[in-house]
Curated annotation (Swiss-Prot):
Keywords: Cell membrane, Lipoprotein, Membrane, Palmitate, Peptide transport, Protein transport, Signal, Transport. It is a lipid-anchor. The keyword Signal applies. This is Oligopeptide-binding protein AliA. Changing residue 30 to A: In strain: R6 / R800 and R6x. A lipid is attached at residue 23 (N-palmitoyl cysteine). GO terms for molecular function: peptide transmembrane transporter activity. It is found in: Cell membrane.
Amino acid sequence: MKSSKLFALAGVTLLAATTLAACSGSGSSTKGEKTFSYIYETDPDNLNYLTTAKAATANITSNVVDGLLENDRYGNFVPSMAEDWSVSKDGLTYTYTIRKDAKWYTSEGEEYAAVKAQDFVTGLKYAADKKSDALYLVQESIKGLDAYVKGEIKDFSQVGIKALDEQTVQYTLNKPESFWNSKTTMGVLAPVNEEFLNSKGDDFAKATDPSSLLYNGPYLLKSIVTKSSVEFAKNPNYWDKDNVHVDKVKLSFWDGQDTSKPAENFKDGSLTAARLYPTSASFAELEKSMKDNIVYTQQDSITYLVGTNIDRQSYKYTSKTSDEQKASTKKALLNKDFRQAIAFGFDRTAYASQLNGQTGASKILRNLFVPPTFVQADGKNFGDMVKEKLVTYGDEWKDVNLADSQDGLYNPEKAKAEFAKAKSALQAEGVQFPIHLDMPVDQTATTKVQRVQSMKQSLEATLGADNVIIDIQQLQKDEVNNITYFAENAAGEDWDLSDNVGWGPDFADPSTYLDIIKPSVGESTKTYLGFDSGEDNVAAKKVGLYDYEKLVTEAGDETTDVAKRYDKYAAAQAWLTDSALIIPTTSRTGRPILSKMVPFTIPFALSGNKGTSEPVLYKYLELQDKAVTVDEYQKAQEKWMKEKEESNKKAQEDLAKHVK
């Protein structure tokens, strides 16, 4: 579910009935096979787990390629390709023993080779040579890797990864990272067979070619058809096949138009689980007939947001009619008071209700980029630490609630006050009003269009259409993705405001969120803020992002005291919140579903590619014949939480055994 954690905005909706008709039912087949049928929303542009930065790829490859460790259903790190591991007492050297029964297989299930320690070395070298989008995860962590990527050293053997023998791979870090093992679930640290890689050349990991990959995971990819379907089959020779309970997985593409279809397809057996849309015309009737089966899932750690393009270069999709309007919009977005007016004037409960309905709107709301309960120290959640820092930025933050599941930002009076300050300053710069803000949206995705329309309504009502106009650009899905999610560089980011992306954490540390928009090296500055990192960007300087980077860097340099580290990251998050450069909106989960998945059997994690809160990982997943009831779910949740606490405690105690 999480490739480097860049997500296209979820909540799109259902596939056409004709598409689903081709899929088998969600129960057992005539041969007694278990089939899981679900949906997907975004086609991958490749299957290259070593270089990608997109969830569209990882949602597929994380089911077919295993790394060193994975998550169990309680979120613990358990053996995968590594049957054992150790860390040196100084925290700088991690050593993993590769299991002897780990094999590579073709897409047809034929054994190709054993998985060896050298495969992990080959994988990282390939990622470095190809300038992987996910290098940010490890480039400054592994000794010598940054120098190799920058060309300061040419010999990869000088990088801190070694195959000590066929079964042992060792990593040497620049500084201790208590969360290092959580990074091993990510594709950039996964193995690849060198002989196969060389044989495929540029055809390695093609988007629609299952034969362009080798498989060492629980499933084999059998077919992938753009805007149609993805199919997996259980790997019969997988070393841990007893924990693979679903024989086939069939995913169908959603086009986002008919929001009544998911429930219909669940009821007729076409889907094993269905995301529900309370704003659909049929939901009221569904509540009457299946009220005991409508379950709201837990909020996860993925944060969707609205980004601000502070350095827009392209204007193919725009309602602006003059260079003066373009210049005025850019000056406005560079003004913090203006951005805060947007943040405070945006009714995010109304926005979320377009997806989750009035009753469920609050269940997905989020106020911080880093979720407030993501980490804890000294008895305080991360959100509490941020609040202590945030109030020092001004009175506007004193009564703001940063907890999940409520809108702590929306305040029309604050919005008007901030806008008044901004307008006075901007008029002195010759800015023309109203400010026109282009916001692209997939015109075929009903709930996406409704959300953007809701944002337009609340902002224009609060700030006045004579001051701010949201110009909705309704485009084809591919057009929207190509100028947001899939844009190759900042020049392709053709928007002023965008809610088309989100971020999920790669590992268990606040840096996994906050590093990604550092102006010098952040991988998502173009996606969220409209400029390419690594440049001496004038707009980034204007909004103070280099000051933000200093805060993040200082936090990252604290490697001995976790409480101090988190406190420093809280200071960086407080700066980011005050800047209003990105406006968090919702989590991915916390939404109503109908399901025949046995509750809490999928692998769980708040970060990484091997744990999820959504049905995008299929190892461990178990199915039942009838729809889960609310009572069953609540009892299972209570039982799982108790078991999780006990299991996590034992896992923490067992860590001492790995220090050598």
